[in-house]
Amino acid sequence: MDSLTAHYQVKQYTLDTSPYGAKNTIEVYNVFSESYGLNKGEDYIILFSVLPELDSKTNWEKIDFKIVKDNHFPMKYIFRRIYYKKFGSPIEEKYNISKVKLVKKIKDTYYVSKYCWVEDFYCANNPLNAPMSTKDYVINTNQPITPIEVIRETFIKQISFCQDFPFEQNTDSFCKIPESLENTYLSNIEEKYGDIVYWFYQFCNLLHTNISRFAYIKDKGIVGGVYFNHFIKGPFFTDKTGNWRKLKRLPENELLWAEELKKEWAEKEKSKK
């Protein structure tokens, strides 16, 4: 963590998982590229999500510093994968950041995240009349709004034999999403206390390691979201403690919001009175 904050702007948020039916937290870290916001077409964000382990009391575990020292990911390469994605170039394994875990130091002890999802995004403002085929990495705030209901209807028509819509999975059978439908779709835009909030959902074949739906605010990053495949397991998942089966799905219009942003909005609301 110290290396990230020393080299890049990082905005950290805490999401309360209570709406799922389990009291825990998700720590999200937005890492901004050096050229973010400079109108150079190089607005990149890497999102690290430290997800909870419901069967234990901590989402971090101790790690020997020697392991950290010998296996660290070079800071100069962390945005390399998204560069390659943007230009459609093959990605060398040494630039693949997907398996990276965060490490933090508390006093003289090092801790590594148990579950860490890593996603990289290119933030665009492309005024196209039709959605770009962006797969899972372009946050285009200037695309047409496409509600989930529209994609659900289109998906069911194209894959009529599929038992589950990807966001409503009830079985362990997962139908591949047609490439023509894979996208990061804009579902809503709203203003809240001076912030323009863009609501997105990722409809792609990497839902098992992606933030499924999220809210994005320019210069603040991803400030809310849901992690469907981490919390909602298939029917054949072995739940040894019973903690996972107690969880509930969140409605399509509900997100886990950053506690820091909720506090900021509450203060703005209070100042209006």
Name the predicted role of every residue range.
Residues 1-273:
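Conserved functional acidic sites
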